[in-house]
Amino acid sequence: ILHIYAAKGMRTYTLAAAERMKLLRRLDAKEHRGKTPLLVAVTARQPAIVYDLIQTGADVNAVDNKGQSALHLAATYGYAQVLQVGQTSMVLIARNVNLHRYLPPLLGFPGHTPLHCAVLAHNALLREQACQMLTEEQQESLQHQSEELECCIHLLVQTGASIYSRDVKSNKTVLHYTVQDGNISLLRYFLELNAFKSKDFVNNKAHGNTALHMAAALPRDKNQKEIVQLLLDHGADPSIRNLDNDQPIHMAPSG
């Protein structure tokens, strides 16, 4: 019943039930998808209840059947308020044991950190926004979601999430993910964060390809020219070859 109260935003009932479940050592009981009441509250976008459950002693490290922690879920859905829960302290992030935790490479989840999840979700929204059939209301809704995800990304980075983390399956960093979808706004953000730091960041390989290889292969309507120039301006090496012995220039679409 605690899961139901949390999902419906019934704060008073949730808190009372949580205190009772804590006494029974069942505060982190899981439902059929492996979600604890805390994970249900995060998914239901109930920041006040998230705060209450954590204060009551809910396990912030708990994961569901897909290996998703509260941070992974909040980042994926773009729930900035959940990440900001609490007035001056971001409770979930302050206990940042999950900032660098990877989703297990099972069931199609290629080992993503919460930051990877947020970037991929932002990319997906960009693809939706490019659809020509959207109404003005739909475009506004997507823009709002996009801004919330950007806020989540900034929060994660500000509190210690590493832009250098690679996913388990493909070895990609957030740089590769932003480039492959032509996400120029996030690309600029990550490149500026890296300025004068790691010389290898821009030239790291994923499946043998650098970000510049990926940028060169982009269609021209995905900011290809601007992204290539940005990468070059930040130290991308056009002479690096991939596993097929191709340099980035060889990856460009014909014509």
Which residues does each predicted region cover?
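Ankyrin repeat domain, specifically the short helix-to-loop turn at the C-terminus of the second helix
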Residues: A16-R25, Y51-D59, Q84-Y102, M133, ...
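Ankyrin-repeat boundary/linker signal
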Residues: K30, V63, R95, P104-L107, ...
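Conserved ankyrin/ankyrin-like repeat signature
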Residues: Y13, A48-I49, Q81-V82, L126, ...
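C-terminal interaction modules of eukaryotic adaptor/scaffold proteins
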Residues: H213-A217, D221-G255
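Onset and early core of a folded interaction/catalytic domain in large eukaryotic regulators
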Residues: I1-A94, V168
